[in-house]
From Swiss-Prot:
Keywords: Acetylation, Cell inner membrane, Cell membrane, Conjugation, Membrane, Plasmid, Secreted, Transmembrane, Transmembrane helix
Family the entry assigns: Belongs to the TraA family.
Disulphide bridges: none
The protein's name: Pilin
Source species: Escherichia coli
Keyword Cytoplasm: no
Job description of the protein: Propilin is the precursor of the pilus subunit, pilin, that forms conjugative pili, the filamentous surface appendages required for cell-to-cell contact during the earlier stages of bacterial conjugation, and that retract after contact is established. Mature pilin is assembled with the help of TraQ and TraX.
Description of how the protein assembles with itself and partners: Monomer. Interacts with itself to form filaments; also interacts with TraQ.
């Protein structure tokens, strides 16, 4: 006959490491060793670090982007239509009003995002 012994009850608590345990002296030295060379290079070559005399390589595509995603483009209309359809279908499936009103919230986010970007 085989006997099986089992111990039941609370196990020993496992201590969770503190967030501040990452800020040890050794870790700070490692961080300094990684950051100081980059800081020295940026100090000696500031024009490379800040791209002061840089040329905008994407400027030629501004008209294409505005034509594709601008206020009067068909892409924005199709995205809004897809939002309305998905919101309606999700509302019919779940009967949750959040899905029905979600398209309005997403439309506001899209309008604000396009205004911020400049489209």
């Amino acid at each position: 006959m085989n006997a099986v012994l089992s111990v039941q009850g609370a196990s020993a608590p496992v201590k969770k490491k503190s967030f501040f345990s990452k800020f040890t002296r050794l870790n700070m030295l490692r961080l300094a060793r990684a950051v100081i060379p980059a800081a020295v290079l940026m100090m000696f070559f500031p024009q490379l670090a800040m791209a002061a005399q840089g040329q905008d390589l994407m400027a030629s595509g501004n008209t294409t982007v505005k034509a594709t995603f601008g206020k009067d483009s068909s892409v924005v209309k199709w995205v809004v239509l897809a939002e309305v359809l998905v919101g309606a279908v999700m509302y019919m499936m779940t009967k949750n009003v959040k899905f029905l009103a979600g398209f309005a919230i997403i439309s506001v986010f899209i309008a604000v995002g396009m205004a911020v970007v400049g489209l």
